[in-house]
Amino acid sequence: MKVLGIESSCDETGVAVYDTALSGVPALRAHAVYSQIALHAEYGGVVPELASRDHVRKLLPLIRQTLGEAGVGIDELDGVAYTAGPGLVGALLVGAGVARSLAWALDVPAIGVHHMEGHLLAPLMEDDPPEPPFVALLVSGGHTQLVSVKALGSYEVLGETLDDAAGEAFDKTAKMMGLPYPGGPQLAALAETGTPGRYRFARPMTDRPGLDFSFSGLKTQVLLAWRSSDQSDTTRADIARGFEDAVVDTLVIKCLRALDAAECNTLVVAGGVGVNKRLRARLQEAAQRRGGRVCFPRPALCTDNGAMIAFAGALRLQAGERADAAVHVTPRWDMAALPPLAAGRDSGVEIREW
């Protein structure tokens, strides 16, 4: 089954072709992402209307490019998957409209995919994928969640942020220290040059039971430290290091608690913040100490992309799910409300190849 995946939930246009007749890395026949960073840089953040208009301009050319790179004719597609939420409503509607129109024209099924389920399942596209049960840390600019995955499609949210997501805290902290947009990656790179321990900030909500997160207070603490400092380049790097250490420590502590709570020893990490080098290293060290395993997708599949949508959509199409003819999106969507997969990779149920 060859599935076209379309991602347009925010400021990146992603397209991919996933082939269920293959497995591991080769199953992803091709994928491409167009980033709108340059478009939004002068505003210091994503402008929803501009994002939607740019998806309109870029989506069809990107589909043609990706099909060409995959060596797949448009009439060879067996299904179309698209991000149906959560995300910016206008941006979502662009992808959904193109996907539903294409599926109708080709007379193939379409399926709307939950954006965060796509992230969660992304590590399963790699060689030697993790098998449920496992705990997933979904950490991005819009979400920070710990999810218990008992089976594919069966999700229980164990904890989530009560305010800012981790990626959002990175971006906002970078902006208030004068770093260019997008700030999160810039701050992480700067932290590599900072002195560990010169600035030590709180590890929010780690001094009490529970698996929820809160990063707004940490952000304020960093702001006060920055305002009272000499604001030199050296101090900026040291504060960046202190902030990153605080976020990473918090995420690691909560992940270990979640593994204990779920009585599980496999951790999956996905989402844009999953590319952070210090977070990856610390989680790998923690997993080794407890004799467990931590799984990441390749960095290109941590940020928003069409590959994760094609893969998640393929699993749900194979399970018999279909979207109706209406173009419907859900800007706010609880992943725990998703129907379980009746069939899917590593689910113990035989998959029907198309």
Swiss-Prot record:
KW Acyltransferase (keyword) present: yes
Localisation: Cytoplasm
EC code: 2.3.1.234
Keyword Iron annotated: yes
GO cellular component, one term: cytoplasm
Manner of cofactor binding, per the entry note: Binds 1 Fe(2+) ion per subunit.
Chain positions recorded as substrate binding sites: 138-142, 171, 184, 276
InterPro entries: ATPase_NBD, Gcp-like_dom, KAE1/TsaD, Peptidase_M22_CS, TsaD
Keywords for the protein's UniProt record, in alphabetical order: Acyltransferase, Cytoplasm, Iron, Metal-binding, Transferase, tRNA processing
Pfam families: TsaD (PF00814)
Catalysis: reaction(s): L-threonylcarbamoyladenylate + adenosine(37) in tRNA = N(6)-L-threonylcarbamoyladenosine(37) in tRNA + AMP + H(+)
Top enzyme class: transferase
Source domain of life: Bacteria
Gene Ontology molecular function, alphabetical: iron ion binding; N(6)-L-threonylcarbamoyladenine synthase activity
Binding site for Fe cation: 115, 119, 304
PROSITE patterns, alphabetized: GLYCOPROTEASE
A biological process from GO: tRNA threonylcarbamoyladenosine modification
Cofactor: Fe(2+)
Similarity field: Belongs to the KAE1 / TsaD family.
Role: Required for the formation of a threonylcarbamoyl group on adenosine at position 37 (t(6)A37) in tRNAs that read codons beginning with adenine. Is involved in the transfer of the threonylcarbamoyl moiety of threonylcarbamoyl-AMP (TC-AMP) to the N6 group of A37, together with TsaE and TsaB. TsaD likely plays a direct catalytic role in this reaction.
Protein name: tRNA N6-adenosine threonylcarbamoyltransferase
Organism: Xanthomonas oryzae pv. oryzae (strain KACC10331 / KXO85)
Gene: tsaD
